[in-house]
């Protein structure tokens, strides 16, 4: 009887040793994922004109959706396409925004858990500001295509992935249109600007039935009229946006 038990334990121990590495080191899926969720941000605005400046701030909330393998791929070609919409209101001043972008890149493995990548891409932003002007229905609309470039780093844990990304978006041929009902409208070109951004994302519960993505981001945007007048040369609007995203991946 003791020989039978001894043989049984010997065989099961050998099986456990063979199977254990697959259990302990099993990597999360590298397939592309869809992520849908909510976002919120706090915006600091600073208008500079000559020797004067004015500051204001506004909160925003919205929705986002993206699809790709930027958070899941280990090495090789990576991509992600996304859209988002935001809305903010303060003291009857309204801010509406939309953005769509596409990221393409290449990722290299440093080791089994650490990866770096280079990303290029482009997109389009639309922003409408509706100030409370006591009687006038006024709309200021900005439309800007952009190109982007960034560096990224992924660290893979057992059941989640941390991503850090930093880069810049360069606006191209932006336009601003001011419309006042009952008065008229006018459009001006915006100068091409290079605006930095950074984001940190964490994809959790990757091996579970309901993975969750959470992240923080920062973006600086500068608007300046493309005109040779004294006013245009000395007037610009700076915006610092601090935000978060939380969503489910599927």
Segment roles from a protein language model:
Residues 40-46, 67, 83-89, 108, ...:
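Transmembrane beta-strands of outer-membrane beta-barrel pores
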Residues 177, 187-250:
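Predominantly the C-terminal beta-signal and adjacent terminal strand-loop region
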Residues 26-33, 68-78, 108-116, 156-164, ...:
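Short loop/turn motifs that connect adjacent beta-strands in outer-membrane beta-barrel proteins
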Residues 24-93, 247:
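Short glycine/proline- and aromatic-enriched beta-strand/turn motifs that initiate or cap beta-hairpins
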Residues 1-35, 249:
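Cleavable N-terminal export/targeting peptides
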Residues 32-34, 55-61, 77, 94-100, ...:
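Residues that define the transmembrane beta-barrel architecture of outer-membrane proteins
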Residues 36-40, 75, 79-83, 118-122, ...:
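Membrane-embedded beta-strand positions of outer-membrane beta-barrel proteins
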Residues 46-54, 86-97, 128-140, 173-188, ...:
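Outer-membrane beta-barrel translocator domains and adjoining extracellular loop/strand segments
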